[in-house]
C-alpha cells in the first residue's frame, strides 16, 4: 500500500469504504508517477476507461428519469456537457480529491488546461474503482449529488443555437439548415463574415461577426427568434 495516500481521508470525502483499498491507490496513481516509481506496477488508465463508461451510464439514467418528456437529441446534448473534461474536473474539485493525486515530477500540472485533464481523468478513475469495489449503487451515490440542479441543467439541454436550429428543422421539417457565407467588413474596417441560414431555400436568419463561428451562431439565433420556436421540452421543468 502506498504510504503517501491517507486512504481514510479519501474514503471520508467519498463517503465510501473500500473493501479493496488497492483499487483506490491505483485510481490515484497518474501514469507519470508509475513511470518514475519502480515499485509501482499499475496506474489509473484502465480504471479511467471503466469509469468513463460508468459515468456515462449514471448521467444518462439520471437525465432519463429527471426529464421524462425530453427527446433523445436534447438529452444527448445535456449528457455531453455533464460528462466532459471541464465538468469532471469540477467534480474532483467539489470532492476535494485533487491533492491526493500521485503525479510524476516531470508531469507537474503547469496550467489550467493541464489541471482540467488530470482532474477529469482522476474522477473517472475513482468512479471506476468504486464501481469495481461496490457496484453501481455507490458510484451513483457519489456522482448524482455533484450534478447541477434540474433548473440548471435546462440551459445545457438547449445547447448552442446551431444545434437547436438543426434539431428544430429535423424534427418539424425533416430538413437541415444551410449556411451561406460572404465576406464582410466591420464599421472599424476589420474583415469578417456575413452568414445567412436558409431552411428549405428560405432565409431564416443572418449574422455578422469577425469569426465564422460567431456569425453562424448569431444567424441561427435570429432564425430561432424569428420563428418564435417554443421548446416543448421545458414542460419537464
UniProtKB/Swiss-Prot annotation:
Its GO biological process terms? mRNA processing; regulation of gene expression; rRNA processing; tRNA processing
Q: Which UniProt keywords apply?
A: Cytoplasm, Endonuclease, Hydrolase, Magnesium, Metal-binding, mRNA processing, Nuclease, RNA-binding, rRNA processing, rRNA-binding, tRNA processing
Q: Name one Pfam family in it.
A: Ribonucleas_3_3
Q: Which GO terms describe its cellular component?
A: cytoplasm
Report residues binding Mg(2+): 48, 121, 124
Q: Does the keyword Membrane apply?
A: no
Q: Name the predominant localization.
A: cytoplasm
As one GO molecular function, the record gives: metal ion binding
Where does this protein reside within or beyond the cell?
Cytoplasm
UniProt xrefs under PROSITE patterns: DS_RBD (PS50137), RNASE_3_1 (PS00517), RNASE_3_2 (PS50142)
Q: What region holds the RNase III domain? A: 7-135
Q: Where is the DRBM domain?
A: 160-229
List, from the UniProt record, the residues annotated as the active site of this protein.
52, 124
Task: Name what cofactor the protein needs.
Answer: Mg(2+)
- EC number(s)? 3.1.26.3
Q: What SMART domains does this protein's entry cite?
A: DSRM, RIBOc
Q: Which reaction does it catalyse?
A: Endonucleolytic cleavage to 5'-phosphomonoester
Summarizing the function annotation, the protein's role is: Digests double-stranded RNA. Involved in the processing of primary rRNA transcript to yield the immediate precursors to the large and small rRNAs (23S and 16S). Processes some mRNAs, and tRNAs when they are encoded in the rRNA operon. Processes pre-crRNA and tracrRNA of type II CRISPR loci if present in the organism.
Q: Give the protein family.
A: Belongs to the ribonuclease III family.
Assembly and interactions?
Homodimer.
Name under which the protein is recorded? Ribonuclease 3
Native species: Chlamydia abortus (strain DSM 27085 / S26/3)
- Source taxonomy: Bacteria, Pseudomonadati, Chlamydiota, Chlamydiia, Chlamydiales
Amino acid at each position: 500500500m502506498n504510504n503517501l495516500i491517507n486512504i481514510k481521508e479519501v474514503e471520508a470525502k467519498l463517503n465510501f469504504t473500500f473493501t479493496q483499498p488497492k483499487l483506490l491507490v491505483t485510481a490515484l496513481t497518474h501514469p507519470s508517477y508509475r513511470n518514475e516509481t519502480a515499485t509501482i506496477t499499475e496506474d489509473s488508465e484502465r480504471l479511467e476507461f471503466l469509469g468513463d463508461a460508468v459515468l456515462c451510464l449514471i448521467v444518462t439514467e439520471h437525465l432519463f428519469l429527471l426529464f421524462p418528456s425530453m427527446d433523445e437529441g436534447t438529452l444527448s446534448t445535456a449528457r455531453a456537457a455533464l460528462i466532459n473534461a471541464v465538468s469532471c474536473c469540477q467534480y474532483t474539485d467539489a470532492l476535494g480529491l485533487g491533492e491526493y493525486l500521485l503525479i510524476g515530477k516531470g508531469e507537474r500540472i503547469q496550467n489550467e488546461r493541464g489541471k482540467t485533464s488530470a482532474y477529469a481523468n482522476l474522477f473517472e478513475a475513482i468512479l471506476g474503482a468504486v464501481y469495481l469495489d461496490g457496484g453501481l449503487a455507490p458510484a451513483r451515490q457519489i456522482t448524482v449529488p455533484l450534478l447541477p440542479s434540474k433548473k440548471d441543467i435546462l440551459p445545457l439541454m438547449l445547447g448552442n443555437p446551431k444545434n437547436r436550429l438543426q434539431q428544430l428543422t429535423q424534427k418539424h421539417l425533416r430538413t437541415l439548415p444551410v449556411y451561406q457565407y460572404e465576406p464582410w467588413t466591420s464599421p472599424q474596417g476589420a474583415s469578417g463574415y456575413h452568414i445567412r441560414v436558409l431552411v428549405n431555400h428560405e432565409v431564416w436568419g443572418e449574422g455578422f461577426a469577425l469569426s465564422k463561428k460567431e456569425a453562424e451562431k448569431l444567424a441561427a439565433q435570429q432564425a430561432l427568434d424569428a420563428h418564435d420556436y417554443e421548446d416543448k421540452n421545458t414542460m419537464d421543468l
